[in-house]
Amino acid sequence: MFRPDKYPGLDEYYQQKHRAVLVERGEVPPLLRLRGHNPNETLVYDPRYEPYFRRMDLLQFVLNFKGTPPWLNATALTTLTDRWRPETHSFHLPLGEMSITLEDIAMITGLPIEGRALTGKVRAAGWRQRVAALVGVEPEPWTDETRKDPRPSGVLFSWIQRHFHRCPKDASPLVVERFARDYLWNLLTQVVFPDGTGDTASWMFLDPLRDWNVKWSWGSAALAFLYRQVWLNIMHFHFIQWDMMHFHFIKSVVGWST
């Protein structure tokens, strides 16, 4: 039972569902599983993509993360996540509070924090056709009428790998642009905005890549997404397994710096 006198400053709603309740009971919270950047689903980088990435102020981010992803310690990330408090949006550590800021995002990742807010209406109708218009290939529709489409929110990384693994040497400028867009879509949805499946690129992060001249605040979106996902990780402790679906690298660097 929640006792305000024992935990001054804590919100009863958050505390009753926080993973810290398990620790207080003497139980060990389940290890959170990492979902994100898979080196086996990395596309081949091509310098011909750079003019497009530079126009969107994302070249530095791509150069930082185009290689093999760094090794991540799931246990350390779980421990850090368990110290997140929604009341303050910060990690409460023995040495004090620590939070991840927009400056951290910009300095560590290279994502731009200036520009338009990455918001808008998400329209599911016709998403396959919109994907085809931007990358030149339409994802196959789900044909099994006896089952619900298991991936209505995007395409499999294996599909992207199959169609866009390497840009042809004799590709036209239009084809190079499509491959560049798909490369960036693949990288963003694996590194910054992964989902719970661990194998799907959400189509809603492809729409902002339509116009290379639009300056989006990708860093702000990344930080908001990270905060939301960390909140989901520490709440609802009664689930046996949880997946960490956010920007693992930035949280690892901030954790190491403490």
Where are these regions (language model features)?
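N-terminal leader regions that mediate targeting or early regulatory function
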Residues: 1-230, 234-235, 239, 244
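Acidic, Ala/Val/Gly-enriched low-complexity intrinsically disordered segments
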Residues: 243, 253-254
